[in-house]
């Protein structure tokens, strides 16, 4: 059955359910919550449990296979990575010290609890500057002692299943675009799924713990300085993944900072590969549009740009 687009009423109801679950979970953990407020509502509903200095992130837009256990496992990894970084005095938004550092499940949602920080609303995002800070983060993450899955952030199952589902949605994607994305993904997927295949395709490219989700974009300008945030997709992979789709200026800024840190420069061939994976994932994201209708317009510029580009990023390229 083809999923229908969620109406504004259903979207609002989903937000309300997530808000109510976050408040109930917070109160269940002993927090005082009298004036909760939704701070963000896109892929997750982010709730400030005011007056408690706690923010809850409740993922709401998810692949069909991402059950509670899958979500909780991913969230435990995030909490472990961020807790370790905080212990090393790396500037992050840390888990809340007022509750156990574990995902909480309530009313069908799996959520995490974070320390509330005041944001400096006068600061404009500067992704070139932030890309320099990503090199600092990578230098710190190299010492992370925990185990991380290889390129789990690429979510190959999501891309494979998303592209398959779009075969029945010509209203969401042009069939010619979908055909191209599936052909490109057929080449890229084996290297994304297998560390051994990646290392064979890109010999000499070291792997390390990564943020996993555009860290230059996920740096929060707090009143006490810049803070790394949103490690939901923490993974093991090449550093190029964290610079995907940011462009030459950000890449140059990262390389400059990496050189000062004694880290390797970005590899152009790996970047082409990573960006090609990202473009296939962008097309696959249209499969989530029934859950999040704004994706149709939000993804259109990226897909139009991809349509005019050659595919030159195969592992053997």
Question: Where are each of the predicted segments found?
Answer:
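Conserved short submotifs of the Hanks-type protein kinase catalytic core
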Residues: 108-119
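A cross-family kinase active-site recognition segment
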Residues: 121-183, 207, 317
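ATP-binding glycine-rich phosphate-binding loop
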Residues: 28-50
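Protein kinase catalytic-loop region centered on the HRD/HxD motif
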Residues: 200-208
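ATP/Mg2+ or Mg2+-diphosphate-binding catalytic cores
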Residues: 2-12, 17, 60, 161-172, ...
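A conserved alpha-helical element in kinase catalytic cores
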Residues: 12-22, 58-107, 124-132, 136
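Active-site Asp-x-Gly
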Residues: 209, 220-272
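Catalytic-loop signature of eukaryotic-like protein kinases
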Residues: 213, 217-219
């Amino acid at each position: 059955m083809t999923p229908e687009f969620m109406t504004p009423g259903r979207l609002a109801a989903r937000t309300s359910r997530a808000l109510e679950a976050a408040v109930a979970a917070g109160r269940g953990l002993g927090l005082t919550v009298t004036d909760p407020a939704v701070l963000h509502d896109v892929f997750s509903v982010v709730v400030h449990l005011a007056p408690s200095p706690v923010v809850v992130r409740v993922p709401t837009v998810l692949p069909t296979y991402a059950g509670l256990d899958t979500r909780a496992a991913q969230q435990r990894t995030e909490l472990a990575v961020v807790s370790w970084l905080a212990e090393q005095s790396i500037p992050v938004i840390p888990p809340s010290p007022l509750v156990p550092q574990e995902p909480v499940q309530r009313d069908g949602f799996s959520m995490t609890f974070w320390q509330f920080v005041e944001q400096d609303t006068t600061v404009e995002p500067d992704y070139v500057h932030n890309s320099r800070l990503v090199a600092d983060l990578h230098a710190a993450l190299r010492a992370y002692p925990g185990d991380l899955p290889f390129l789990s952030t690429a979510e190959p199952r999501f891309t494979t299943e998303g592209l398959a589902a779009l075969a029945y949605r010509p209203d969401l994607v042009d069939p010619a675009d979908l055909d191209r994305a599936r052909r490109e993904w057929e080449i890229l997927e084996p290297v994304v799924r297998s560390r051994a295949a990646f290392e064979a395709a890109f010999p000499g490219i070291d792997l390390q713990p990564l943020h996993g989700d555009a860290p230059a974009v996920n740096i929060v300008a707090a009143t006490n300085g810049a803070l790394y945030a949103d490690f939901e997709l923490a993974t093991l992979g090449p550093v190029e993944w964290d610079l995907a789709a940011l462009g030459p200026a950000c890449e140059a800024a990262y390389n400059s900072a990496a050189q000062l840190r004694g880290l390797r420069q970005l590899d152009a061939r790996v970047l082409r590969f990573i960006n090609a994976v990202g473009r296939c994932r962008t097309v696959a994201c249209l499969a989530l549009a029934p859950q999040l209708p704004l994706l149709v317009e939000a993804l259109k510029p990226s897909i139009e740009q991809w349509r005019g580009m050659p595919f030159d990023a195969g592992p053997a390229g």
